[in-house]
């Protein structure tokens, strides 16, 4: 009988899109599976993925992930053509697809990839329905973050 691998906390995340939370208000999040090829799974296990410029396009009743880069390994099979920027189909329920279509058809909404992670043996992508932030919204977020840090610093020093 084989031993189970020790699970390292935090090791399930492959890639994060930190820029998405800075540039968009995330209204709702969904978890979607990815339709991948064999070399892509190997590369994801090695952590060779980037989703910072990725977005989701809805067409023909399906959702596709565009702009995600999965860099092929050097030892990848030579008889398979490896396209690191190819569009990948997202695996969602029909109810979730309908919800995405309804929200994206509203003014100013888009769907962006937030994170790429492992759930058991399956690769999942967390996508979010987002609305773009204006420059003043970004500045107010920065002010709030700085105030939170200052408040924590003041409370820490007040106890001394």
Curated annotation (Swiss-Prot):
One record GO biological process: trans-translation
GO molecular function, one term: RNA binding
Localization of this protein: Cytoplasm
Keywords: Cytoplasm, RNA-binding
Gene Ontology, cellular component aspect: cytosol
Cross-referenced InterPro entries: SmpB, SsrA-bd_prot, SsrA-bd_prot_CS
The keyword Cytoplasm appears for this protein: yes
SUPFAM superfamilies, per database record: Small protein B (SmpB) (SSF74982)
CDD domains: SmpB
Chief localisation class: cytoplasm
Coiled-coil zones: none
PANTHER family: SSRA-BINDING PROTEIN, TMRNA-BINDING COMPONENT OF TRANS-TRANSLATION TAGGING COMPLEX
Family under the similarity heading: Belongs to the SmpB family.
Protein role: Required for rescue of stalled ribosomes mediated by trans-translation. Binds to transfer-messenger RNA (tmRNA), required for stable association of tmRNA with ribosomes. tmRNA and SmpB together mimic tRNA shape, replacing the anticodon stem-loop with SmpB. tmRNA is encoded by the ssrA gene; the 2 termini fold to resemble tRNA(Ala) and it encodes a 'tag peptide', a short internal open reading frame. During trans-translation Ala-aminoacylated tmRNA acts like a tRNA, entering the A-site of stalled ribosomes, displacing the stalled mRNA.
Protein name, as recorded: SsrA-binding protein
Gene: smpB
């Amino acid at each position: 009988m084989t031993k189970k691998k020790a699970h390292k906390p935090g090791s399930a995340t492959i890639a994060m899109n930190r820029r998405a939370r800075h540039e968009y208000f995330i209204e709702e999040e969904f978890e979607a599976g990815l339709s991948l090829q064999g070399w892509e799974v190997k590369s994801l296990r090695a952590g060779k993925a980037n989703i910072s410029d990725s977005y989701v396009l809805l067409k023909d009743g399906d959702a596709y992930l565009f702009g995600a880069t999965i860099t092929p390994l050097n030892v990848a099979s030579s008889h398979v053509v490896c396209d690191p920027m190819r569009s990948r189909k997202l695996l969602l329920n029909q109810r979730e697809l309908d919800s995405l279509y309804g929200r994206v058809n509203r003014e100013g909404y888009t769907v962006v990839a937030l994170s790429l992670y492992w759930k058991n043996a399956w690769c999942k992508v967390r996508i979010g329905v987002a609305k773009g932030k204006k420059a003043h919204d970004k500045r107010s977020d920065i002010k709030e973050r700085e105030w939170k840090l200052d408040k924590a610093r003041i409370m820490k020093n007040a106890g001394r």
